[in-house]
Amino acid sequence: MNRKLMSRSMLVVITLSVVPWCWLPYLLTAGEEACFYCGMKRSEHGHSWMVIEYDDGSSGGFCSLHCASIDLALHTDRTLIRILVADYYRKNLIEAETAHWVIGGAKAGVMTTRAKWAFESKEDARKFINDHGGKPATIETVLKAAFEDMYGDILLIQKKRKTMHMHKLKTDHN
């Protein structure tokens, strides 16, 4: 076992006995940019990544509009400066206010049952709609939809995690 992996493993073992479980996703992705709430890595979700910046200088990176919406709801005491979102195709961060959004369609969303994707150009948004369905939307529309979808999305996430846990237990016993 190499030194880096060994020290990371030791850190996780020691930390699990001291730090609350809510920090586990963050600790397991140490050294990588990962979503504060679910631990999903930017390297795997660069097409849906979001960054929120507040007036107090704080900011956060999130795997999806779902997790970014949670952050917005929890930080109503801060003034929002801007929201950046990844262009679906290019994965570069763009202003969420000026992005061309698509809501719905056949392409599965990240952490949600109703997908919400951002595009830098109107042409790319149209191409996506032609290929996968969905409707054009604004930032206001997708944020409202994210909050409307929250309860159902949380139930879906819990169900998926339970299924993954049961599958892991099953394979560990075989």
Residue ranges of each PLM-predicted region?
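Intrinsically disordered, low-complexity linkers and terminal regions
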Residues: 20-61, 65-174
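N-terminal Sec-pathway targeting helices
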Residues: 2-12
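Bacterial N-terminal signal peptides
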Residues: 12-20
